[in-house]
Amino acid sequence: MKVLLKTIIAVAGVCFLLSAVSIRQSTPWVAPASADTIQNPLAGNVASVDSGKKLYNKYCVVCHGSKGMGDGIAAAGLNPKPANHTSEAVQKQTDGAIFWKLTTGRPPMAGYAKTFNETQRWQLVNYMRALKAPDKSK
């Protein structure tokens, strides 16, 4: 009887932990409101888009894919799945929110505050803006 009780408690504990992880991973990633006030010092800088593309192709495509659709070769094994940078959900975020996410990260994505300097992170933001989905109404 004691073995059965211990087994039930152990299974219940594992189920609880798995459900907690699942809930966290399905929670939308929202930057704090303060991130919306961060201004992009490179907004409109065409050269920064090219620089961001080089960084993106070296560091981001493995998860986010070459077109930013979240379909890189590593994406299948990740939970939560990588963001689709062409999506309306990403594109409607402020530059500051995207910059904050690049800086801080959230598992499985690392934060890049130490990998990229501030200018490089803004270059990535500008390149991600260039990835927006084509307008289908035209």
Residues of each region from the PLM?
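Bacterial N-terminal signal peptides that target proteins for export
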Residues: M1-V11
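Signal peptide cleavage region of secreted peptide precursors
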Residues: A20-Q25
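Bacterial N-terminal signal peptides
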Residues: I9-S19
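Short, non-ligating residues that shape and space the ligands of small metal-coordination modules
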Residues: M69-G70, E118
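Short, flexible, mixed-charge acidic loops at enzyme active sites
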Residues: P28-V30, I73-L78
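Sequence/structural segment immediately N-terminal to covalent heme-attachment motifs in c-type
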Residues: V46-M69, A75, I98-T104
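Extracytoplasmic electron-transfer domains, predominantly the class I c-type cytochrome c fold
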Residues: N79-L131
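Electrostatic cytochrome c docking/interface patches
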Residues: S26-L55
